[in-house]
Amino acid sequence: AVEKVRHVGDLVACVAAVDEATAMEALNLFEVEYEVLEPVFDPKKGLEDADEPIHWRGKYHLARTNVQKRVFQEFGDRSLVETPLASSHGKWNMAGVHHGFTEPHAVVAHWDPNGRLQLYTPQQVPHYTHRALATVLDVPMHQINVIRTFVGGGFGGKSDPFPHEMCAAILARKSGRPVRITFDREEVYWINRGRHPSHIEVKMTADEEARISGFDIDALIDGGGFASFGHVTSYYNGVLATAPYELGSFHYTGARVWTNKPASGAMRGHGAVNTRCAVEVGLDEMSEQMKVDPIDLRLANLLPPH
C-alpha cells in the first residue's frame, strides 16, 4: 500500500531475514499510524458518491463513486418481449468464493552474477508477471527470467502479478541473496482474487413458439480493493450469459464496484458462473409455465451450426 490501505490485510511493508522467527521479530518493531476512513463494504453503497473514493483516477473517474467499470450491451428487437407467453424474473445474491488451492502463494527470487533476475513462482500468468517486474524494477525485460514452477492448484487464483513477487525481487536485489516468500493460509485469503460476490437480476421471456424472445440482465459485482481481472469480469457477466442460445433480444447492464475487502478476480468459469446459474434457473421456470420439457426448450433455442 502507498499512502492508503484499501482493506484489512493489504500489504504495507516487507522484511527479509535469515529465518522466519527473526523476520517476525523485525515486523513487530514497525509502528504504523492510520487515519481511519469510512469503509465501503456493500457494493450498493459503492454506487453512491463518496467523500474519499477507494481509488481516484482523475478525469477518468466516474463522478465521485467507487465504480470501477460500467458495461452496457444490447442487440435484437426489444419489441419482442412485450407480449410473452412465458416469463421469469429472478434476483440473486451470490457470495464470493475462494479457489481453495492446496499450494499457497510462494516465490523465490535471486539476481545472478550477470545482473539478471531469476524469479521462480507457481504463476498462471508468467508473462504478465514478467512485464510487471520490468515496470516495477525499471529493468529491461531481457534481464528478467520468470520461471513458472509446477502450479499446485490455481483455478484462476494465481493469475495476477502479485506484490509479494515484486517484494521478493526487490529484497533479493537489496540483500544480494536469494529471497523466499511463502504465504500461510490466512495470507492467501487476504490476497484472495476469488469469484466476485454479485447481485444479479435476470428477466427473460419466451413467445408462443417457445422461442426465447429476450434476456434482460443487470449485474452488480463486488470487486474488493483492487482491479485484478475486474474489467473483463464486468464484460463476461454479459457476453457469456447468452451461452449457446439464439435470442430475439438481449440487454445487459453491469457495474464493478471497489469495496474495502480483499480483491476479487478470476475463478473457474470466470465471469460466467453467476449469471449462467440465474439464466438456467429462469429457463427452467419458463419451461414449467409452458409445460414443455426443459431440455427440449433448450434444444429448440440453440444457435444454428456455423
Predicted regions and their residues:
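FAD-binding glycine-rich core of flavoenzymes that anchor FAD
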Residues: 97, 170-188
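Conserved helix-loop functional segments at active or binding sites
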Residues: 97, 135-139, 253-256
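Alpha-helical support elements that line or immediately flank enzyme active sites
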Residues: 12-34, 106-175, 231-242, 266-301
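Extended, polar/acidic
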Residues: 1-132, 230, 235-249, 260, ...
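Short, surface-exposed loop/turn segments at secondary-structure boundaries that line and modulate
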Residues: 1-10, 44-48, 52-59, 128, ...
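Short, well-ordered strand-loop elements centered on a beta-strand within folded domains, enriched
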Residues: 115-122, 209-219, 256-257
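Short beta-strand elements
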Residues: 106-111, 199-208, 214-219, 245, ...
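General beta-strand structural signal in soluble alpha/beta enzymes
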Residues: 7, 88-92, 119-121, 143-148, ...
